[in-house]
């Protein structure tokens, strides 16, 4: 895979992510804020963006979404086998909920 292919894949991922984020925010704002890990301010901006603005933002060569697994405890919950999947998901949700939301810098 060459550099241009990677940039194209990143743009496609960005577009999908932004469109999904808008849909999630429109359907259930509180759940979307939690799941996306974004601030109210960023949510407001995403909801008011036009399709042309979404496409333009998605066209960057940098990924707009990121892994929220900065904490080794969260990554451990995902990678280690657990007998109780419900408990595993609950623990992960609690750990993710403690993380600060993304702010616009």
From Swiss-Prot:
UniProt domain comment: The C-terminal region contains a putative helix-turn-helix (HTH) motif, suggesting that this region may bind DNA.
Protein family per UniProt: Belongs to the FlhD family.
Keywords from the named record: Activator, Bacterial flagellum biogenesis, Cytoplasm, Disulfide bond, DNA-binding, Transcription, Transcription regulation
Organism for this UniProt entry: Ralstonia pickettii (strain 12J)
GO MF: DNA binding
Subunit structure: Homodimer; disulfide-linked. Forms a heterohexamer composed of two FlhC and four FlhD subunits. Each FlhC binds a FlhD dimer, forming a heterotrimer, and a hexamer assembles by dimerization of two heterotrimers.
One Pfam family here: FlhD
Broad class of where this protein is predominantly found: cytoplasm
Entry's Gene Ontology BP terms: bacterial-type flagellum assembly; positive regulation of DNA-templated transcription; regulation of bacterial-type flagellum assembly
Membrane-spanning segments: none
InterPro entries (alphabetical): Flagellar_FlhD (IPR023559), FlhD_sf (IPR036194)
Subcellular location: Cytoplasm
UniProt KW Glycosyltransferase keyword: no
Role played: Functions in complex with FlhC as a master transcriptional regulator that regulates transcription of several flagellar and non-flagellar operons by binding to their promoter region. Activates expression of class 2 flagellar genes, including fliA, which is a flagellum-specific sigma factor that turns on the class 3 genes. Also regulates genes whose products function in a variety of physiological pathways.
UniProt superkingdom: Bacteria
Name the UniProt record assigns to this protein: Flagellar transcriptional regulator FlhD
GO CC terms of this entry: cytoplasm
Taxonomic classification: Bacteria, Pseudomonadati, Pseudomonadota, Betaproteobacteria, Burkholderiales
